[in-house]
């Protein structure tokens, strides 16, 4: 405990001199009327590490319908989707696994200390300004240290508050579609003065998710409908922005999410029975203060409180209702200090502190009441001159694990110990070089070392968890070339090509402890290599006619390299496809804009053993989107129709969890 107090004291001294901003570059700007020196699109080409972006216009023109659909349009991503509007959706990047993917919401990382995997199905696109994926280090060095702790970060940026007038602005929207889907959305925003703005967002989603599916049993084809799949989901946000003066700004957010859903379970022959129910609730509040002085120093301070609950019940459990519920909490604060002595150099120091704890409804689910203190510090330097940009970072991570005692009669010897404390220095470096002075063609290279602390489930879950686990260590290497052509008014082109090699050691996997019980151990070693390619082009025939095309392709080999004598050696890791790709072709015109889009994913295995007959077949999902925008003075109406999986393909992403076949969705959006 004395060590914790000492560390917090040192951190407290650091907090008085640290902070951050949310600009795309690391330039210092006045907080009033922020000017971004590069467009977000161009930054995907100049970045020293792979950066992929979908802004609000992309989401519309590419026919994106939900967060999972949006992520399919980004290279290097593998999605685990359990199907339907309420199905859990997690994402892994370049074979690392979902626990290695961080998710940032309006510049602050989301927390999931229990499983380490963020369920992205809870975040809709209706209030999103853009989504970006950073693989490696972010060129914007003015970020919390926590954003540097994962191999990849998915950034979700919501719509910004208005700055043009003091009139109230109201957005109303309703979506409805197949399988009982309906989702109303409301957003109110207003500038009350030139210093204070406010917005409120509300959203509700209901779906029966009773979609049909087919199941092959030898020569027999079974036709059935998904059952026990209903969902009720609500989400609300309050946001404010206060420009205290030209150099000081305070922003805040209050967020609440509630989803009461049934879990349909796996589809098996002759049965579709399930009594599982899950209610997820999440509340957080966060504030961010930004200031700058002297045109050289900038400071950002963020604080956040997060609470979430997962209430699980199975009414069909033998012997009565099975209740496995969990509650987790986090207190988090971060400060960052940015120093830009001249136009070439930038330096950032960031320090974070987080306290997390977890408790369950029974000692037989979580051993004791674990909690963790986390201290993170990062020092970053960035150098830019003409055609060369170099970035280097050193991250220090400290995890102090403890647990409250459980009654002596209720614990085993392994439960007497908390997880091990962990500390590590993690270096990273990246660079970008412009090949020709008159052409936007760049080569880039990067290296990043990082480690992942075991989650509370991996350390404390009854029988399954082990407090003796070591952290997973990852190394990632990337080389790439990028190109853009934007000098012609009627034609724009963006291309990127990256090759990578990743290495994971001390991988945490579950192995049989005895005939009936599995437990987590460090046994795995994984080698990953592949390529990511993207292409985006727009050709405008006239101000009202244009053709837009975007596409990406990824190849990834994710191999088990732990034991050469094992029959699984060099086999593809479970749920990692070798080939993925997507494309969208859009025709803009004065009448109805039309987009045809598709996703292709190759076959996968649901296990690392590759048992005969268990391979999940690859699939192609093609959709059609038609939309029209009409303007009436200052009011705007948008009508949109989406036909999903229009060729009615039956496929699975997760083994025995069939995805919906052909369906439709209608969206009506009116802005006052």
State the predicted function of each range.
Residues 207-213, 222-235, 241-300, 305-330, ...:
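Flexible loop and strand-edge segments within Gram-negative outer membrane beta-barrel domains
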Residues 296, 300-314, 442-448, 452, ...:
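Membrane-embedded beta-barrel scaffold of Gram-negative outer-membrane proteins
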Residues 549, 600-607, 615-617, 626-672:
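C-terminal beta-signal and adjacent terminal beta-strands/loops
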């Amino acid at each position: 405990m004395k060590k914790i107090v000492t560390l917090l004291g040192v951190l407290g001294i650091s907090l008085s001199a640290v902070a951050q901003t949310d600009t795309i570059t690391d330039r210092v700007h006045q907080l009033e009327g922020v000017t971004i020196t590069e467009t977000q699109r161009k930054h995907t080409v100049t970045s020293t590490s792979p950066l992929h972006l979908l802004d609000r216009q992309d989401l519309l023109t590419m026919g994106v319908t939900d967060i999972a659909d949006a992520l399919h349009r980004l290279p290097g991503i593998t999605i685990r989707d359990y199907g339907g509007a309420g199905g859990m959706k997690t994402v892994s990047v370049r074979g690392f696994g979902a626990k290695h993917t961080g998710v940032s919401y309006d510049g602050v990382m989301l927390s999931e200390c229990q499983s380490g995997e963020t369920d992205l199905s809870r975040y809709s696109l209706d209030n999103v300004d853009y989504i970006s994926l950073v693989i490696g280090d972010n060129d914007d060095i003015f970020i919390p240290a926590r954003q540097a702790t994962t191999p990849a970060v998915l950034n979700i940026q919501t719509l910004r508050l208005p700055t043009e007038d003091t009139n109230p602005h109201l957005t109303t929207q309703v979506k409805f579609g197949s399988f009982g889907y309906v989702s109303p959305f409301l957003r109110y925003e207003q500038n009350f003065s030139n210093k204070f703005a406010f917005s409120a967002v509300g959203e509700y989603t209901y779906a029966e998710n009773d979609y049909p599916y087919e199941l092959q049993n030898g020569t027999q084809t079974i036709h059935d409908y998904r059952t026990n799949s209903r969902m009720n989901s609500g989400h609300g946000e309050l946001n404010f922005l206060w420009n205290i003066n030209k150099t000081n700004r305070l922003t805040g957010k209050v967020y609440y999410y509630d989803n009461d859903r049934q879990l349909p379970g796996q589809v098996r022959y002759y049965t579709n029975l399930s009594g599982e129910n899950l209610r997820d609730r999440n509340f957080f509040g966060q504030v961010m203060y930004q200031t700058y002085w002297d045109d050289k120093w900038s400071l950002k301070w963020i604080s956040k409180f997060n609470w979430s609950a997962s209430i699980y019940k199975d009414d069909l459990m033998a012997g009565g209702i099975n209740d496995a519920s969990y509650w987790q909490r986090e207190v988090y604060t971060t400060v960052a200090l940015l120093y830009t002595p001249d136009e070439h150099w930038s330096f950032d120091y960031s320090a974070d502190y987080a306290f997390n704890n977890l408790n369950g409804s029974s000692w037989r689910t979580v051993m004791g009441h674990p909690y963790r203190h986390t201290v993170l510090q990062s020092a970053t330097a960035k150098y830019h001159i003409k055609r060369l940009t170099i970035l280097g970072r050193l991250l220090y991570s400290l995890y102090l694990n403890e647990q409250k005692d459980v009654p002596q009669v209720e614990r085993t010897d392994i439960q007497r110990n908390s997880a091990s404390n962990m500390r590590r220095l993690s270096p990273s470096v990246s660079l970008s070089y412009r090949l020709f002075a008159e052409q936007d063609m760049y080569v880039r290279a990067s290296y990043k070392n990082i480690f992942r602390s075991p989650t509370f489930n991996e350390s404390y879950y009854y029988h399954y968890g082990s407090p003796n686990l070591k952290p997973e260590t990852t190394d990632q290497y990337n080389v790439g070339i990028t190109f853009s052509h934007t000098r012609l008014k009627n034609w724009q082109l963006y291309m990127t090509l990256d090759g990578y090699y990743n290495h994971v050691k001390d991988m945490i996997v579950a192995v049989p402890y005895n005939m009936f019980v599995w437990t987590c151990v460090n046994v795995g070693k994984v080698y990953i290599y592949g390529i990511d390619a993207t292409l985006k082009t727009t050709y405008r025939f006239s101000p009202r006619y244009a053709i837009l095309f975007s596409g990406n392709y990824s190849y990834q080999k994710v191999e088990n390299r732990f034991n050469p004598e094992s029959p699984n050696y060099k086999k593809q890791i479970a749920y990692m496809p070798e080939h993925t790709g997507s494309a969208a072709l859009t025709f803009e015109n004065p009448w109805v804009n039309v987009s045809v889009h598709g996703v292709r994913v190759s076959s996968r295995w649901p296990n690392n053993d590759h048992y005969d007959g268990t391979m999940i077949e690859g699939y192609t999902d093609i959709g059609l989107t038609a939309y029209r925008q009409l303007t009436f003075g200052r009011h705007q109406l948008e009508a949109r129709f989406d036909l999903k999986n229009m060729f009615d393909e039956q496929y699975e992403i997760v083994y025995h969890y069939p995805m919906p076949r052909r369906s439709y969705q209608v969206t009506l959006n009116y802005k006052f």
